[in-house]
A protein has these predicted regions:
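Helical "substrate-binding/catalytic lid" subdomain
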Residues: 167-287
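Hydrophobic beta-strand scaffold residues
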Residues: 27, 46, 115-116, 200, ...
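Rossmann-fold NAD(P) dinucleotide-binding segment
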Residues: 50-113
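Rossmann-fold dinucleotide-binding core
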Residues: 64, 95-177
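Amphipathic alpha-helical hairpins
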Residues: 11, 15, 59, 65, ...
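NAD(P)+-binding Rossmann beta1-loop-alpha1 motif at the extreme N-terminus of oxidoreductases
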Residues: 1-63, 88, 93-94, 158-159
C-alpha cells in the first residue's frame, strides 16, 4: 500500500484521512490544529510540520481552507515542498481556484514532484462514505497515479478528469456557482410562499416535487423547516469564498458574472449577520430577516 501524508484534518479532511487508513494505506498526518492530528494517532503517525509529513510519504494529499493556505502549507517555511522527494506526488483536494493550483504545480515541477488538483463536491456524509464527486486536473500520468486513492475517497462514476492542472478547480467553481445560486432561488421561493400564506410543509412539498431545484430542497428541507442551520454540511463562509473565487476567475478572463456577483453579495450579507459558520442554506434565514412576517431570523453578529 502507498505511504500517504494527509495535511488538513478539518470537518472534511478527518473523515477522508480515516478512509485512506481504513483502506490499508500507511498514513502520516499533519494539521494546523494539532489536536485534530492527534485524534488519528491510533492509526497514523503525527508529523510536526508539513515538511516532515512530506519526507515520510510517497503521495501527499492536502485538504485546506483556500489558496493562501495551500501556498503557505506547501511553499512556506517548513512547507510540504521541502519534504517531498523527487518522483513523489501531491493531490490537492482543497477548493482554491485555478491560479494557486498552477502556482504550486509549477513550483513542485521544478523539484520533480507531480501535482494533481482534485477538489470535491459533497459534505461530511459523502466524505465519510467515500462517495464524494471529484473534479480532477493534471497530466494523464499523474492522474492515473492518483486514481487508486481518489477511488477510496470518491465515487468512481462521479470522478472526472477534466483537463490540465487548474481544470479541476475550474470545474469545482462552476459547480458551486450553480449550487449557490440555486440555493438562493430556493430560499427566495420558500420565503415568497410563506409570505403569501403557504404553510412551511406545503411550500416545501411543492418546491421539492415541482421545481428544478428538487435535490437542493430535499437535502435542505429539514433546515429550512426548522430554521436550524447549526450542523453544517458545508459552511456558509466557504460557499461565499467559492462564489468570490468564481467571480474573480471570470474577471481575470475579462468577463463578468452579474448574477453570481449578486448571489455572492447575499452570502456576504449573511456572513455579516453572524451566519458564517452555519450551513450555507442559512442564506434563507438572512432572506427571511428581510421579510419580518416570517418567524426564523438570523442572530445579530
Amino acid at each position: 500500500m502507498t505511504r500517504v501524508a494527509f495535511l488538513g484534518l478539518g470537518r472534511m479532511g478527518a473523515p477522508m484521512a480515516g478512509r485512506l487508513s481504513n483502506a490499508g494505506h500507511d498514513l502520516v498526518v499533519w494539521s494546523r490544529t494539532r489536536t485534530h492530528a492527534e485524534a488519528l494517532a491510533d492509526r497514523a503517525e503525527v508529523a510536526g510540520s508539513p515538511a516532515e509529513a512530506g519526507s515520510k510519504a510517497d503521495v501527499a494529499v492536502t485538504m485546506l481552507a483556500d489558496g493562501a493556505a495551500l501556498e503557505e502549507v506547501v511553499l512556506g517555511r517548513d512547507g510540504l515542498a521541502g519534504g517531498l522527494g523527487s518522483g513523489s506526488l501531491l493531490i490537492d483536494m482543497s477548493t482554491t481556484g485555478p491560479a494557486p493550483a498552477r502556482k504550486v504545480a509549477k513550483a513542485l515541477e521544478e523539484r520533480g514532484v507531480g501535482f494533481v488538483d482534485a477538489p470535491v463536491a459533497g459534505s461530511i456524509g459523502p466524505a465519510s462514505e467515500g462517495t464524494l464527486a471529484i473534479m480532477v486536473g493534471g497530466p494523464d500520468e499523474a492522474v492515473e497515479r492518483a486514481r487508486p486513492l481518489l477511488e477510496v475517497l470518491g465515487d468512481p462514476q462521479r470522478t472526472w478528469h477534466v483537463g490540465p492542472v487548474g481544470a479541476g478547480q475550474a470545474a469545482k467553481l462552476m459547480v458551486n456557482l450553480v449550487l449557490g445560486g440555486v440555493t438562493v432561488a430556493v430560499a427566495e421561493g420558500y420565503t415568497l410562499g410563506r409570505l403569501l400564506g403557504l404553510s412551511p410543509d406545503d411550500a416545501l412539498d411543492v418546491l421539492e416535487g415541482a421545481s428544478v431545484a428538487t435535490q437542493t430542497v430535499r437535502s435542505k428541507r429539514d433546515m429550512l423547516r426548522s430554521g436550524d442551520y447549526g450542523h453544517p454540511g458545508f459552511r456558509l463562509a466557504l460557499m461565499h469564498k467559492d462564489l468570490r473565487l468564481a467571480v474573480d476567475a471570470a474577471r481575470a478572463a475579462r468577463a463578468s458574472l452579474p448574477g453570481t456577483e449578486r448571489v455572492a453579495e447575499l452570502y456576504a450579507g449573511a456572513k455579516g449577520r453572524g451566519l458564517a459558520d452555519q450551513d450555507y442554506a442559512a442564506v434563507a434565514a438572512y432572506l427571511a430577516s428581510m421579510a419580518p412576517l416570517l418567524e426564523h431570523t438570523p442572530p445579530e453578529s
